[in-house]
Regions:
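Alpha4 helix (beta4-alpha4-beta5 surface) of REC/receiver domains from two-component response regulators
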Residues: 65, 72, 84-116
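Conserved beta-strand segments of alpha/beta enzyme cores
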Residues: 32-34, 76, 100
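Two-component/phosphorelay signaling modules centered on CheY-like receiver
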Residues: 18-35
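C-terminal output/effector regions of signal-responsive regulators
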Residues: 119-182
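Acidic, metal-coordinating helix/loop segments flanking the phosphotransfer/catalytic sites
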Residues: 18, 35-53, 61
Length: 182
């Protein structure tokens, strides 16, 4: 059995919705969690502390500004959104350095996205496309047919640059189809 790569990881969770923070705390109970519900408190924590990762809401807490801080400090960030779910925010998050872009409807798999990110980083894969491969059918259903056509250059470069590895699935015995709430 694989050891839990999340155990003891320092994770900053940022969201303006208390129920989202509580849900994430429950999902990531093996991690050392800190939370922030405003831009100001999150900015202060990001600038003064060291984290293994940050999970950032896009809308209510100026997530893109926080992503820039996290990227500058080399803190891997996963973007979490409901109201900001759009092709533009998805590509914008990646351009600013986000390691993943997770719709809030997929919140119950946040541990999988984090485990995958940490495992692949250990293997030297900094630009993983696994999260996108897992969520591509969701994005296709949500954004509609041809949604990537608006930014063909970006998505073509993404496909060339971001690696997809089966290492995570083998290590954690995760099926390609995970259960999601929509």
């Amino acid at each position: 059995m694989a050891t839990n790569i999340l155990e003891g990881k320092r994770i900053l969770l940022v969201d303006d919705e208390p129920d989202i923070l509580e849900t994430l705390i429950g999902i990531l109970d093996e991690c050392d969690i800190e939370t922030a519900s405003t831009f100001e408190s999150a900015k202060k924590l990001l600038e003064s502390k060291v984290y293994d990762a940050a999970v950032l809401d896009i809308m209510g807490v100026r997530g893109f500004d926080l992503l820039e801080i996290a990227t500058r400090k080399k803190i891997p960030a996963l973007m979490l959104t409901a109201h900001g779910l759009s092709p533009e925010n998805l590509s914008g998050s990646i351009k600013l350095g986000a390691k993943s872009y997770v719709p809030k409807g997929k919140i119950y798999d946040m541990d999988i996205f984090l485990k995958e990110m940490f495992l692949l980083q250990e293997k030297g894969i900094e630009k993983s496309g696994n999260w996108f491969a897992r969520l591509s059918s969701f994005f296709d259903n949500h954004f509609g047919h041809g949604w990537k056509d608006k930014d063909k250059r970006f998505w073509s470069e993404f496909d060339k640059t971001y690696q997809v590895s089966s290492e995570f699935d083998r290590t954690y015995q995760v099926s390609k189809e995970t259960t999601y709430l929509f």
